[in-house]
């Protein structure tokens, strides 16, 4: 499933509403180095998909690198079981809630960043509602009906 940054379609909103967490020098939060950790949202850009998931690429202000990629599904396990009909129990469990994305490279700080998400952001109801709103906005641009008059003509034989 392809994912695209929310920023790519809504740059001004993303600039204003992307969440970051500051870890101070002596705080030792989850053994993370002092930095601001920005949680950049990415959503599925496959037409017709309704996975209700977000991937956070977490970028450190110190390294300017992606330190973790967290997948988060906010719906129930029953929702994901119906959505992914042929998935195993393990597949379904991985779709719901936060986890490090297994197919993305992760830094040595990824586990600590995941705990930071679980302890702070996942429990912030207004933030999770904002992510859901961003998902709906993004999906509306992916799933909007196409004008048949704008279709390209096929050429060749």
Annotated model-derived regions:
Residues 2, 38-40, 102:
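Mixed-charge, polar/low-complexity N-terminal
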Residues 116-157:
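C-terminal charged interaction modules
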């Amino acid at each position: 499933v392809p994912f695209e940054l929310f920023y790519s379609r809504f740059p001004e909103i993303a600039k204003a509403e992307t969440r970051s967490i500051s870890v101070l020098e002596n705080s030792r939060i989850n053994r993370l180095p002092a930095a601001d950790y920005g949680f950049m949202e990415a959503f599925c850009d496959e037409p017709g998909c309704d996975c209700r998931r977000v991937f956070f690429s977490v970028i450190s202000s110190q390294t300017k690198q992606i330190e973790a990629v967290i997948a988060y599904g906010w719906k129930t396990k029953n929702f994901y079981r119906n959505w992914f009909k042929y998935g195993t129990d393990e597949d379904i469990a991985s779709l719901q809630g936060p986890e490090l994305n297994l197919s993305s490279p992760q830094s040595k700080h990824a586990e600590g960043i995941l705990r930071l998400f679980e302890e702070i952001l996942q429990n912030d109801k207004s933030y999770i509602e904002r992510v859901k709103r961003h998902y709906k906005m993004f999906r509306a641009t992916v799933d909007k009906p196409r004008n048949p008059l704008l279709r390209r003509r096929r050429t060749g034989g």
